[in-house]
Regions:
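N-terminal Rossmann-like NAD(P)+-binding subdomain of aldehyde/semialdehyde dehydrogenases
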Residues: 9, 16, 20-153, 347
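ALDH superfamily catalytic-core signature
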Residues: 251-394, 458
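Conserved C-terminal structural/oligomerization subdomain of aldehyde/semialdehyde dehydrogenase
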Residues: 55-61, 241, 278, 332, ...
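Residue-level signal for inorganic ion chemistry
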Residues: 56, 77, 92, 114, ...
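Structural signal for hydrophobic packing residues in well-ordered secondary-structure cores
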Residues: 81, 85, 100-107, 111, ...
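Short, well-ordered beta-strand elements within core beta-sheets of diverse protein domains
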Residues: 59-65, 80-86, 166-167, 277-279, ...
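Rossmann-like NAD(P) dinucleotide-binding subdomain of oxidoreductase/dehydrogenase enzymes
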Residues: 148-287, 415
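Short, often N-terminal, low-complexity regions
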Residues: 1-3, 8-11
Length: 499
């Protein structure tokens, strides 16, 4: 079978990338972790099956690291820190450039793995593969502009790297989180131990190979794939880890925060969300509804920033529902390799069952289905697919309006006036992201200023990598991206005295 040619890629021959992956290996055995600049066999001996969520077939197996492997990785990072922390900006910028080029060169391979192992639809999968390299480029720009020394009165303030950073990443955008957290840590002068999700081992292998090819000093970064209760717990409690950065559920984030408190680790947590989408009464529904549905179903609903609570004016509810029903009817759920697919499978059977349970709860609590419902989409017999689902007549005390579902299930709530819309939006434990849509940008920004969320998107779904990202309330602690993300790995030291 021939390799993909440039012309084939330019003609959007999507199948070619997947054919190359299949040719290389149908069943992958991943039996190495990365410690001290080398691929090594884990001390742990547990084997974990990897599934294609679109077919429910086993596509690989990974040998998991254990607590001893985590300790070895932490020791390697600790040994590397004294030398690496003294490197200059230019040296670290050059490293980030090499990392960017190496990950970029793996884009097609990573894209295919994301679609096969995670089930991301092709458009989302391509963005995720590109994001893995672009975050390295963004970190390079931030580092280039950053001043590590500044004045405060008579004092010199030096921003100093914290030490060994433990980076714990989720399964819903494995490569991007690995590269993004690592880029910020290295830019600051920290060394790192990364624990990716065991469900993303194929993607992790590709990223690890790319980062190895970038030629960083041994021990500067280490990647140990294992379970949270073993590897994650060791990283969270080890006295030689100075910094923790975790993305995942609020429940696990609280556990990590408690574990790190014993040694007063600096902690960044990017946790769950229940993002409101406020549609103001002057909004053009023809423009807004497609954006609202995209916000809710992004990443097949498996996104902490998904806009899952849609707030609409009571007097326009019927009009909004009709437009939503039409939009969801044309939202294809199914084979992630099909360019027309917008919603792929849930990552696992456990996640599929979780989403089905919430759909049943919504019906039991009196919400009214206007699209979707339980079970798989019509014509789909296998795979962990969910019917894109929208409930109306939802009140903010219902379970589906309060708990993070992490699937393509949206709730429509109504409000009488703007003050009530804001009150409903803020009546949640979460505060990660919010969306406001209005024909009047000034009015939308006024509403945005009153929302309790780390990010508010006004009349857009666009991402800004230079802006801080993180949550209010139980959506997290600290910020990632841009200068804020860099400084999460730095500690200010004041130096006073006569020169």
């Amino acid at each position: 079978m021939p390799d993909c040619t440039a012309s084939q890629r330019n003609r959007a021959d999507l199948s070619c990338v997947f054919q190359n992956l299949i040719r290389e290996a149908v069943m992958q055995m991943i039996d190495k972790i990365y410690i001290d600049g080398a691929f090594v066999t884990p001390h742990g001996d547990e084997l974990f099956d990897l599934f294609n969520p679109a077919t429910e077939q086993v596509i690989g197996r990974v040998r998991l690291a254990d607590a001893q492997d985590a300790c070895d990785a932490i020791a390697a990072a600790k040994r590397a820190f004294p030398t690496f922390s003294r490197t200059g900006k230019r040296e670290r910028i050059d490293m980030l450039k090499r990392m960017h080029e190496a990950v970029l060169a793996k884009e097609d391979e990573l894209y295919a793995a994301i679609t096969e192992e995670y089930g991301a639809p092709v458009s989302r999968g391509r963005w995720m593969a590109q994001h893995a390299s672009s975050v390295l480029l963004e970190a390079e720009k931030v580092l280039d502009d950053y001043a590590f020394t500044r004045r405060a009165g008579t004092a010199e303030v030096v921003m100093q790297p914290l030490g060994v950073a433990g980076l714990i990443t989720p399964w819903n955008s494995d490569a991007g989180f690995i590269c993004g957290k690592l880029a910020a840590a290295l830019a600051a002068g920290c060394t790192a131990v990364i624990k990716p999700s065991e469900m993303s081992a194929i993607q992790t292998r590709i990223v690890t190979e790319a980062l190895h090819e970038a030629g960083l000093p041994a021990g500067v970064f280490n990647i140990v794939t294992g379970r949270g209760e073993t590897v994650g717990a060791q990283i969270s409690t080890h006295p030689d880890v100075a910094k923790l950065s975790f993305t995942g559920s609020t429940v696990v984030g609280k556990t990590i925060l408690r574990a790190g408190a014993e040694t007063l680790k600096r902690v960044t947590l990017e946790l769950g969300g229940k993002s409101p989408v406020i549609v103001l009464d002057d909004a053009n529904f023809d423009e807004v509804v497609p954006l609202a549905i995209q916000a809710g179903f992004m990443n097949s609903g498996q996104a902490c920033i998904a806009g899952t609570r849609i707030l609409v004016p009571q007097h326009r509810l019927e009009e909004f529902e009709a437009r939503v029903q039409k939009e969801v009817t044309h939202t294809q759920a199914g084979d992630p390799r099909d360019p027309q697919t917008a919603v792929g499978p849930m990552v696992s059977q456990k996640q599929w069952e979780r989403v089905q349970r919430y759909i049943r709860i919504g019906t039991d609590e009196g919400a009214r289905l206007i699209a979707g419902g339980p079970g798989r989409p019509d014509g789909v017999d296998a795979g962990w697919f969910v019917r894109p689902t929208v409930f109306s007549d939802v009140t903010n005390d219902m379970t589906i309006a309060r708990e993070e579902i992490f699937g393509p299930v949206l709730s429509i709530l109504t409000y009488r006036d703007t003050d009530e819309a804001i009150a409903i939006a803020n009546d949640t434990l979460y505060g990660l992201q919010a969306y406001v849509f209005s024909a009047d940008a000034k009015r939308a920004h006024e509403v945005a200023s009153r929302l309790e969320a780390g990010r508010v998107l006004v009349n857009t779904l666009a991402h800004e990598p230079a802006a801080p990202f993180g949550g209010f309330k139980q959506s997290g602690i600290g910020r990632e991206y841009g200068t804020f993300g860099l400084e999460a790995f730095l500690e200010p030291k004041s130096v006073l005295g006569v020169l």
